[in-house]
Amino acid sequence: MEQMDAHQIISFIQNSKKATPVKVYLKGDLEKIDFPSDVKTFITGNAGTIFGEWAVVEPLLEANKANIEDYVIENDRRNSAIPLLDMKNINARIEPGAVIRDQVTIGDNAVIMMGASINIGSVIGDGTMIDMNVVLGGRATVGKNCHIGAGSVLAGVVEPPSAQPVIVEDNVVVGANVVVLEGVRIGEGAVVAAGAIVTKDVAPGTVVAGIPARELKKLDAKTASKTEIMQELRQL
């Protein structure tokens, strides 16, 4: 999938059909209810479950109060513009609780851990691990064989469209609870220490730390050993 630019994302959101889907468990004299074709029904006898848009389901429930003994509604969004990514055929390990929106590219053997939030237009390279509770903003790009530590935030940009998103090149290790501001590029093989706030570009093969992040040294054998990417964790 080709990465979307900001104007394409804005157009996608603007033109998308906004959705408020609901799931309703109900019981009663359901055979007397004429369910419209755009409501999916899974009903046996006097109980069942229906799925549909709230704009359709709400008047249906109201019009059939006499035939419905009780019901419970589940709803997790309102006028949502972007659906979640269909993950069934992605060649990656994606753990429960990750929230990944549509139009995200995920490379082969990538790992997305619990609680990660990945916004529209983001790109995750082959073999990259996105750890727990990481946030990838819109259009944020992470290269191959990287590790983005738990709780880190890579700023994304949809508006203003002229701004640039974060770009992380290949073989980068980002520690836990790092914040990388919009427009920053982290060069290949760099290491960002935990808790850093990265406000400017990071040169390839360097180690940075602090608030704001500053270069400490060039990547050496000791640091490389401590930040080794384990391919065993990426096998499917």
UniProtKB/Swiss-Prot annotation:
It holds the Pfam family DapH_N. Pathway: Amino-acid biosynthesis; L-lysine biosynthesis via DAP pathway; LL-2,6-diaminopimelate from (S)-tetrahydrodipicolinate (acetylase route): step 1/3. It catalyses: (S)-2,3,4,5-tetrahydrodipicolinate + acetyl-CoA + H2O = L-2-acetamido-6-oxoheptanedioate + CoA. GO terms for molecular function: tetrahydrodipicolinate N-acetyltransferase activity. Belongs to the transferase hexapeptide repeat family. DapH subfamily. HAMAP family: DapH (MF_01691). NCBIfam families: DapD_Ac. This is 2,3,4,5-tetrahydropyridine-2,6-dicarboxylate N-acetyltransferase. It comes from Listeria welshimeri serovar 6b (strain ATCC 35897 / DSM 20650 / CCUG 15529 / CIP 8149 / NCTC 11857 / SLCC 5334 / V8).
